[in-house]
């Protein structure tokens, strides 16, 4: 049971990509204002897909992952006898196993906070261009620590629902919200604003090394 993602790795132990926020959680964020709106579920999926695609990995929740690569892959680099692998995640909580050419590696490795895995003491005989490398690891923000991401998605969905209805501003309980004019008329849940992207900065993959 696994799901192959569009970001180059596999989630194991699940048969669908887990949602980042449930419909009930969205209703809690919005005080059930849209509880009977049939667009909520599809807009949530659209918004969370936009977040994940912008960040370059599944972001949340924490999940068992597997990356299959080779020494030829752009996410792999070799310096002297040290192997560096850029895991497609910025929050990796643990490494389960590292297998090189079918043999599990049990020597020294270091996991960096930015998702770079450094593997030391490799034999030069292992370092052939197409040698298979498989890393099993756990990555993602735990569901109970992802309120900031959930709130961002909830806001993105709310903007989509309100702008599609032609609402440009509203006031409730002394709080006034003005919707970005660029989102009015045909706004979608996938349109991440600049302030959304700022919030997502810590979760976005920065590229290789």
Predicted feature descriptions by range:
Residues 1-209:
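Divalent metal-cofactor coordination and adjacent catalytic microenvironments
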